[in-house]
Each structure stands twice: as structure tokens, then as C-alpha cells.
């Protein structure tokens, strides 16, 4: 993300928390909609989906305020860096902790997701490389 006028402030932290909260809510409501639909509650599912769409727009509002949306090359790089963090640091650490605490099956799931995140990073970096060839 590009630096914003909020850099280093509590307001920046609040914007980041708002983005994370709205993003999490969107995902939860999407999952809730799927469950309601499977149980035959079409109207409830539709309400969850409508609310999820609202949460998506709220998240976008805060993400844009944080200059989180760049041009396509910047977005590919940001995505690649995020995926790199997830597979090299986040999920690796989660797996080690789960193993240490005796949750070996969960540790294995963390490692499997890490491998997928690595693939995501590779795809984004390949696309970024291809994009750079177009702009030469």
C-alpha cells in the first residue's frame, strides 16, 4: 500500500481494523447464506448475501482510504507479497504452534494451505512478469 495521510496514526489503525472487520463479516455472512440455503431458507440466505455485499462495499471504502488499490502491477505485487507472508511466515508459524500443542492434524492442514498460498504467490509473480513484458 502507498503511504497515506493517516500513516502512523491511530486513525490508520482504525481504518485497518474497520477494513478487517468488514471483510471478516462479509465472509461469515456468505458462509451463513450457504448454510441457510442448504437448509431451505432461501429468504434468509438472500438477506445474508445482501448484507455481505454491503459489507464488501464498506470494506472497499476503508481500503481505498488506505490507498490499498493501486494499478494492476501494484496490485499483483501486493498480492504476491501477501501470499508470500502467508506461506513463509504465518502458516509456518501456525503449523509449528499446532504441532507443539499436539494438534498435528490441524498443523498438517496449515501446511497444506501454505502450499496453496505458495502457488498463489507464484501465479501473481508470473502475471506481474508477463505484465512487465507488455510494457517494455
Regions inferred by a protein language model and the residue ranges of each:
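Helix-loop segments that flank and shape redox-cofactor active sites
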Residues: 2-10, 25-46, 64-72, 94-106
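Solvent-exposed, well-ordered amphipathic alpha-helical segments
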Residues: 4-16, 97, 126, 131-132
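Alpha-helical transition-metal enzyme core signature, strongest for iron centers
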Residues: 21-29, 48-62, 80-87, 110-124
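A mid-sequence interfacial segment
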Residues: 92-131
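Conserved small/polar residues in nucleotide/adenosyl-binding loops
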Residues: 134-136
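Short, recurring structural edge motifs at helix starts
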Residues: 14-20, 31-33, 77
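Short gly/ser-rich anion-binding loops that grip negatively charged ligand groups
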Residues: 69, 73-84
Amino acid at each position: 500500500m502507498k503511504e497515506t495521510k493517516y500513516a502512523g496514526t491511530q486513525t490508520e489503525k482504525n481504518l485497518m481494523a474497520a477494513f478487517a472487520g468488514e471483510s471478516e463479516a462479509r465472509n461469515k455472512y456468505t458462509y451463513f447464506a450457504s448454510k441457510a440455503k442448504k437448509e431451505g431458507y432461501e429468504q434468509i440466505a438472500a438477506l445474508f448475501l445482501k448484507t455481505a455485499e454491503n459489507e464488501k462495499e464498506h470494506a472497499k471504502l476503508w481500503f481505498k482510504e488506505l490507498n490499498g488499490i493501486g494499478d494492476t502491477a501494484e496490485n499483483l505485487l501486493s498480492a504476491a507479497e501477501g501470499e508470500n507472508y502467508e506461506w513463509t511466515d504465518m502458516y509456518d508459524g501456525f503449523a509449528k504452534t499446532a504441532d507443539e500443542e499436539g494438534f498435528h492434524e490441524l498443523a498438517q492442514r496449515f501446511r497444506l494451505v501454505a502450499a496453496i498460498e505458495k502457488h498463489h504467490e507464484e501465479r501473481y509473480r508470473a502475471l506481474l512478469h508477463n505484465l512487465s513484458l507488455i510494457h517494455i
